[in-house]
Amino acid sequence: MSVAGLRRAARESVAGLPGAFWWLWTSTLVNRLGAFVATFMALYLTIDRGYSASYAGLVAALHGLGGVVSSLGAGVMTDRFGRRPTLLVAQVSTAFSVALLGFMRDPVAIAAVAFLVGMASNASRPAVQAMMADIVRPEDRVRAFALNFWAINLGFAISSMAAGFIAEYSYLAGFLIEAGMTLACAVVVFVKLPESRPERTPGDGAAGHAPVSLLTVLRDGRYMGVVGLSLLVAVVFQQGYLGLPIAMGEAGFTPADYGLVIGFNGVLIVVLQIPVTRFIERRDPRNLLVVSALLAGYGFGLTAFAGSLGVFALTVCVWTLAEIVNAPTQTGLVVRLSPVEGRGRYQVG
């Protein structure tokens, strides 16, 4: 494709999206520029603190469990109190809990605060996705979710490379930088983003649409099927931040080496997400999710045969292609399955 063609494709990819979307996009980018804990927690615990890989796995599991628990409550808050208040509470709580985690030394305290960090950081997800669905036209949603995922990984590509060198100097500095950047996100939300929750009408509720509860969500067979399969794929992708750093550490590589390798994930997404999305946005999401799951399994399976930085980087490139296809497709499908009055609750998956 010519340079003019690339410019035209870029313009078409960002055209027609409302200003509120771009402020939400900016908040996401700022948040990911400060990302540190999720990327380097395993290395921090095993290399800096001297704990075992099994303990690092336990902490990662508690961090994930906190996210699962909080997403249920955050989904209800998003629908009941609004997207904006939920975002503000989640981001301020994340900033304080991440800073606190950097000062913890006792293994029980580390595990407990990691659980709180997981709760706080994941609480913003239902609100972000519901707000994005509110403010973007249905035909533009896959593109909008892809651009948001692109922002996540643009920030991640920069932060992961920088964080590797920060970790060589001070892990505590990484925790404090993430806390500060998360507070900056809260400021953007507070100053620039209005509430987007659709107004309830007299026809809602018993006289019109049935009210949406968590029980309604759990009884939705199609949605729960998507959630179950997405959970399995998410467990696989999580190995990029748990299994991969431990494998590289055991092979004698440094945190900076891991930061360089995992940085390929963000760089590839930044380069390929927009053109790939233009190719897949009108295709059957079921087929796309199947292809992405197979590609993810293949990519992570290759890690067993990696022994050099180049091969580790190659494995990251393979499963990153799966992530590029999976992320906007899965999020767009969830929004399609969710009723307007229950968007927050439906984003918990």
Language-model-detected regions and their locations in the chain:
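Helix-to-loop junctions at the C-terminal end of transmembrane segments
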Residues: 70-82, 272-285
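Cytoplasmic helix-loop-helix junction between adjacent transmembrane helices
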Residues: 114-152
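Juxtamembrane intracellular "pre-TM" segments in multi-pass secondary transporters
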Residues: 2-18, 194-228
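Helix-loop-helix hairpin linking two adjacent transmembrane segments in secondary transporters
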Residues: 148-190
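Structural signature of the two symmetry-related core transmembrane helices
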Residues: 85-99, 287-302
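Conserved MFS/SLC helix-loop-helix module at the cytosolic interface between two early adjacent transmembrane helices
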Residues: 68-105
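Residue-level signature of mid-helix packing/kink "hotspots" within the transmembrane helices
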Residues: 36, 64-72, 156-157, 266-274
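Helix-loop boundary and gating motifs at the non-cytosolic
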Residues: 17-64, 222-229, 233-261
